[in-house]
């Protein structure tokens, strides 16, 4: 299947410079979806300006959603900015993005993937648990109230 067909279908793929505008829209929608908690995203505007750079990897699923990967240390990475537009929720797009990110992380030699999430993100928390993520100790300095930390052994 060609790249144009994959973009329309929304299959997760590695983002390239041509995806910058879509990624910026998705990231801004992500922040807006967090409500007041979006105020705690330190360095967010710089992240958006640098897209698709600023992360070790960004995956995009057409204009349906995105997810990013950031190195924590030699063997650990962090899932960041998973976002699926409301119209695409419940279609499996989020699961596909995460599974693709996990594949890339394993191929990159990572043995653990971390993420942080908020109690208000109930569906996301359920999805993470269904994929094997478990609660873990704090691994970053996220200042958001009530933030929860999870990990997946890869």
Where are the language model's segments positioned?
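Conserved GNAT acetyl-CoA-binding A-motif
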Residues: 105-117
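Actinobacteria-biased recognition of intrinsically disordered, low-complexity terminal regions
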Residues: 1-7
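Acetyl-CoA-dependent GNAT
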Residues: 8-10, 14-80, 85-86, 98-100, ...
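Active-site acidic-Proline motif in GNAT/NAT acetyltransferases
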Residues: 85-91, 119-120
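Conserved short alpha-helix immediately C-terminal to the canonical SAM/SAH-binding motif I
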Residues: 97, 121-124
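Terminal substrate-recognition subdomain of acyl/acetyltransferases
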Residues: 2, 148-154
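Residues forming the Rossmann-fold NAD(P)(H) cofactor-binding site
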Residues: 91, 95, 99
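Conserved catalytic-core motifs of GNAT/GCN5-like acyltransferases
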Residues: 42, 114-122, 129-150
């Amino acid at each position: 299947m060609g790249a144009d067909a994959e973009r329309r279908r929304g299959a997760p793929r590695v983002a390239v410079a041509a995806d910058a505008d879509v990624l910026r829209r998705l990231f801004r929608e992500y922040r807006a979806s967090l409500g007041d908690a979006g105020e705690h995203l330190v360095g967010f505007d710089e992240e958006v300006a640098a897209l698709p750079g600023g992360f070790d990897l960004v995956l995009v699923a057409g204009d349906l959603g995105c997810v990013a990967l950031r190195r924590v240390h030699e063997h650990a990475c962090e899932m960041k900015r998973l976002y699926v537009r409301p119209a695409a929720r419940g279609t499996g797009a989020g699961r596909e993005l995460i599974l693709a990110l996990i594949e890339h992380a394993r191929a990159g030699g990572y043995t653990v993937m971390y993420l942080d999430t908020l109690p208000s993100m109930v569906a996301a928390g359920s999805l993470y648990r269904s994929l094997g993520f478990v609660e873990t100790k704090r691994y970053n300095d996220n200042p958001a109230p009530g933030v929860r930390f999870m990990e997946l052994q890869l």
